[in-house]
Amino acid sequence: MKIVVTNDDGPHSPLLEPLVRGLEAVGNEVVVVVPERPRSAAGLARTYHKPLRVRRLGGYYVVNGFPADAVFLALKLIAPDAELVISGVNVGENIGIEATYGSGTVGAALQAGVLGVPSIAASMEVGGDVDFMIKVVEGAVASARAGLDGVLAVSINIPSVWKGGVYCVRKLARAVYRERLYEGVDPRGEKYYWRWGPRRSEFEPDTDAYYFYYMRGVTVLGLSESGVASVENFGRKLGQLIGAVKVDC
């Protein structure tokens, strides 16, 4: 299978090379097209106010735009015959409605879906096992071969410690973090602000955050034009391929 790999962490992401090696080891042709620098939290941002440029960096193509721009150039110029787009693996999970729709990783996958190419966004909690990550992504690729009809993209989140479950998400957590506004004063006497906050300790059952943080499961989310979409067959197949002891799909 010919696969475009992109991300929102740029060409120096520690998870990019292992992912590419893993996909190539099982016979896939991989074309890497990524933003030239980290573009986390870019969502579906696109570039319209300046020219886009592509250059080679080793074996990768790098783009001076957002993750969605990288996918657009990949599918329109560099690899128009790609059969699948994998966005990630993101360094850090994308859980909850804000992270899902604000994520450049997920945004890139949605861009591929809008262009008619099946796509998978993959994110892993910091400290996760790279070998397990590759196993999950390879399982997702095999599951996608059966088709992803009715969805623009599938978003998969991999916990740092897996307790054996795969959960198909039907509801996103509304607020994963207790964000607040922090105010400071710079050396010139001008005010500045940071938005930040700790993760919540409790989540509503049956949300992606509950399955991820409490059940420590791999979560599978289908995204369509109308929001959350069913990916039950995909989730069941993925669970089978990675040896899950519980599949809730």
From Swiss-Prot:
GO (cellular component) term, any one: cytoplasm
Cofactors (names): a divalent metal cation
Positions with a binding annotation for a divalent metal cation: D8, D9, S40, N90
Organism this protein belongs to: Pyrobaculum aerophilum (strain ATCC 51768 / DSM 7523 / JCM 9630 / CIP 104966 / NBRC 100827 / IM2)
TM stretches of this protein: none
Name of the protein in its database record: 5'-nucleotidase SurE 2
EC nos: 3.1.3.5
Reaction(s) catalysed by this chain's protein: a ribonucleoside 5'-phosphate + H2O = a ribonucleoside + phosphate
Described function: Nucleotidase that shows phosphatase activity on nucleoside 5'-monophosphates.
